[in-house]
Every structure is written in structure tokens, then in C-alpha cells.
Amino acid sequence: MAPKQIFILEDEAILLCDLEDLVSHLGYQLAGSASNVDEAITKLSSGMKPDLALLYLNLNGIASDPVADHLIAAGVPIIFVSGYGTRGLADRFAGFEVLQKPYDEAKLAEALALALRPPE
């Protein structure tokens, strides 16, 4: 079975590289990444359909909501990432997982496994 593909939206280059490495280390494949909303929408609109997306909540003052909406409409599970907990999370995303930065490998591994688990 091919590794699950993860898309990452993160505006800080060093954190993006770290997260890409961590995702690979956990046995997943990087489907793609973006550092801003427009870049993410462009890539995802080109036919890319990852198995899951990790979305940083606040991209230099801009919410990642449009990317989340696009992914949800496409049936792609998402996990939000934030250095500030759920602050800035739109009410409509209240039930979604929010991982706290800095990344904890065990928590990330658990969140990815749960989000990618087939429905029972």
C-alpha cells in the first residue's frame, strides 16, 4: 500500500521544512506544500487531492479558512496547527483537531493516524 499523502500549509519556511521532515519520518509522503492561501488554493485546484492536510491557522495575519473550506468540499480531512491554541479558529471549524506548535512527534503521529483511520 502506498503511503498516505499529506499537504502542508505553513508560512514559516523553517517550520515547514521541519514539519515536512517529521511527516516523512512518520512514514507519510508529502503531497505538496504552500506558504500562503493563494498558493495553496492554486495547487489544490490543479487536481491535487491529498489524503490529509495540515493547515496553519494564521498565515501572517491571514486565516487559512478558504483553504480549509476548499479541502472540506473535496472531502479531504484537515488538522489545524497553531501556536496559540484555538484562538483564531472560526466557529464552523470548532470540531476539528488543532495541534499546538511546537510540534510533538507523538501527538502529531496520533492525530494523523486518527484522522486517516477509515470510518467504522
Regions picked out by a protein language model, each given a short descriptive name:
Residues Y56:
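Active-site residues of response regulator receiver
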Residues A13-G32:
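Two-component/phosphorelay signaling modules centered on CheY-like receiver
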Residues M1-Q5, D104-E120:
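Non-catalytic signal-transmission and effector/linker regions of two-component phosphorelay proteins
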Residues I79-V81:
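Hydrophobic/aromatic residues positioned on beta-strands within the core alpha/beta folds
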Residues N36, G61-P66:
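Acidic catalytic/metal-coordinating carboxylates
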Residues E10:
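Conserved acidic carboxylate
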Residues S33-L52:
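Acidic, metal-coordinating helix/loop segments flanking the phosphotransfer/catalytic sites
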Residues K101:
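A Lys-centered signature of the CheY-like receiver
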